[in-house]
Amino acid sequence: MFIIKNNYFLYIENTQSINVDFLKSNKKISIIYRNNGIQESLVKLSIFRNKCKIKRFKFYIANNLQLAKNCQADGLYISAYNKKKYLKYNLNLIGSAHNYKEIHGKIKQGCKTVIFSRLFKTSYKNKKGSLGVIKFNLISQNCLINLIPLGGINIFNLLKLNMVNSEGLALLSEIKKKPAISNRLF
């Protein structure tokens, strides 16, 4: 029941969303801090960053270059709506995309990895439609960068991820809903 991938990306909205102490030390895990609400203090983020360093997790900040520099994050996560170019900052960049046009935009921004959204059907009201394994594999063959699937990944379709032509996977809401999924993955 294990999924063997080279990279695991976990989205968090605050530092209390995930307890890093329960995860095993692993170089393959990357945590993306994506806070759209109330900004946490720099002290809390620095403490969380140090915990990630101890566990050998990579830590990325979403769409905030100054905060990424202040926290000494491993890189910057660029959302699909963010069109700025960060080539001159010498950071590890991860992008997010929903279609082929956005993938090429992220390549121009300098992203080495793109998290491509909705692999499976999700339970959100306004977000309908999904790619499926076959369409994702066809798109990933045409891209020169690493595409990481996101969306709809849950306990019931974990084994389908072995068929996905990708070096990793990304989890957003499943970690918050059912933390036990992390035991099956890592």
Segments and roles (model prediction):
Residues 76-87, 115-127, 152-186:
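Glycine-rich phosphate-binding active-site loops on the catalytic face of alpha/beta enzymes
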Residues 31, 68, 106, 114, ...:
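Conserved, mostly hydrophobic/aromatic
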Residues 12-24, 64-66, 99-105, 154-159:
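Short, acidic/polar
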Residues 4-12, 29-33, 59-61, 76-78, ...:
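Hydrophobic faces of well-ordered beta-strands that scaffold small-molecule active sites
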Residues 24-89:
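N-terminal active-site wall of soluble small-molecule enzyme domains
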Residues 93-122:
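Histidine/lysine/aspartate-rich catalytic loop segments that bind and position anionic ligands
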Residues 44-60, 88-100, 128-152, 186:
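Alpha-helix-loop-beta-strand connector modules within alpha/beta enzyme cores
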Residues 25-26, 71, 109, 142, ...:
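Structural motif
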